[in-house]
Design a protein with these regions (language model features):
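Outer-membrane beta-barrel porins/channels
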Residues: 4-27, 31-37, 53, 69-197
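N-terminal periplasmic accessory domains that precede
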Residues: 38-50
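Short beta-strand segments that buttress and anchor functional surface loops
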Residues: 58-61
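A short, glycine/small-residue-rich beta-strand->loop->alpha-helix junction that serves as a flexible
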Residues: 63-65
Length: 197
């Protein structure tokens, strides 16, 4: 009897983690909040605006078992209609003890995930914006590594007088450059965790 288990909905699932405290408090992925909190641009690049100019967002969380999650983002406007931001999002899973099948210690190893982001947003009208994110992705688990490239495409509608906002975003469209090598040397490439919100 052969048993095979498959879990998850794509490689690099850390891309779906919230990057800031407010984002986590709003359920993890709010794509409509149009204010000066630059961290929401990680979820929807169309949320960049004149309000995020020269803002810096720094976030760090120490989870259980020394799992560290962090992000940094900086916003810059290049005109009254063109907004950009650059950021990094990482997860450090800590140091693990490597043992063999009879519990002899062989050493230690680490595991880390990271995405570097470049975001651009264009003001289409007084109420509509469109944004795109490009994110090279890197992952290192013990001696296995993988890299990829992901893109997000987002739209935002905001009417401050009516106190109404809406968003639409397609996240994590892309591919792996190289997959994690298996024990027999296969290099299987997997899909990214594509998400339409």
């Amino acid at each position: 009897i052969v048993a095979i288990a498959q879990g998850g909905n794509g490689v690099f699932p850390f891309l779906n983690l919230p990057t800031g405290a407010r984002q986590a408090a709003f359920g993890g992925s709010n794509i409509t909040l149009y204010d000066n909190d630059l961290n929401f641009a990680f979820a929807n690049p169309a949320l960049l605006s004149e309000k995020t100019h020269n803002f810096l967002g720094l976030n760090y969380t120490n989870q259980f078992n020394d799992v560290n999650i962090g992000s940094a983002i900086y916003g810059r406007n290049f005109s009254d209609k063109d907004f950009m931001a650059f950021g990094i999002h990482y997860v450090d899973y800590g140091t693990f003890l490597e043992t063999n099948e009879i519990d002899q210690t062989l050493g230690t190893f680490t595991a880390k995930d990271m995405a570097i982001t470049a975001m651009y947003c264009r003001w289409l009208s007084p109420r509509w914006t469109m944004g795109v994110t490009m994110k090279p992705i890197f992952s290192f688990y013990e001696r296995y590594s993988s890299s990829g490239l992901g893109f997000d495409l987002g739209f935002s509608y905001h009417n401050e007088k009516a106190l109404f906002a809406a968003g639409l975003v397609l996240r994590n469209v892309g591919f792996q450059f190289n997959g994690y090598n298996s024990i027999n040397g296969d290099n299987k490439q997997e899909i990214l965790p594509i998400d339409l919100q």
